[in-house]
Amino acid sequence: MSISSRVKSKRIQLGLNQAELAQKVGTTQQSIEQLENGKTKRPRFLPELASALGVSVDWLLNGTSDSNVRFVGHVEPKGKYPLISMVRAGSWCEA
């Protein structure tokens, strides 16, 4: 799937026409049309386009979204630590 097909499918999914998307991005309807027809490979308004479509720039370019959040599974505690109350913690230091 190319950037042009991703933009078009996401635009249709959001129920926007080319003119409405162009207005959100801050460009012309002709620019969106050229992008969707594959005449523009990497538009200069890519960050604005991604924001208007609610996707990442990486998704527009590659079809993947790199997230810094990953599920690592259930983490088991390795040991136990003593609970220190505020009173006890304060008695350790002298001022």
UniProtKB/Swiss-Prot annotation:
Q: Which Pfam families match?
A: HTH_3
Q: Out of the domains of life, which is the source?
A: Viruses
Q: State whether keyword DNA-binding applies.
A: yes
Give UniProt keywords alphabetically: DNA-binding, Repressor, Transcription, Transcription regulation
- PROSITE patterns in the record: HTH_CROC1
Per its UniProt record, what InterPro entries does this chain match?
Answer: Cro/C1-type_HTH, Lambda_DNA-bd_dom_sf
Record domain HTH cro/C1-type: where: 7-60
Q: Which SMART domains match?
A: HTH_XRE
Instruction: Cite the GO molecular-function annotations of the record.
Output: DNA binding
**Positions of disulphide bridges:** none
- Among its keywords, does the record have Cell division? no
Q: Which residues form a coiled coil?
A: none
DNA-binding region range list: 18-37
Instruction: Describe its function.
Output: Binds to two sets of three contiguous operator sites in the phage genome.
Assembly information from the UniProt record = Homodimer, when bound to an operator.
Record-given protein name: Repressor protein CI
Q: To which species is this protein native?
A: Enterobacteria phage 434 (Bacteriophage 434)
List the lineage, top down. Viruses, Duplodnaviria, Heunggongvirae, Uroviricota, Caudoviricetes
Q: Which gene encodes it?
A: CI
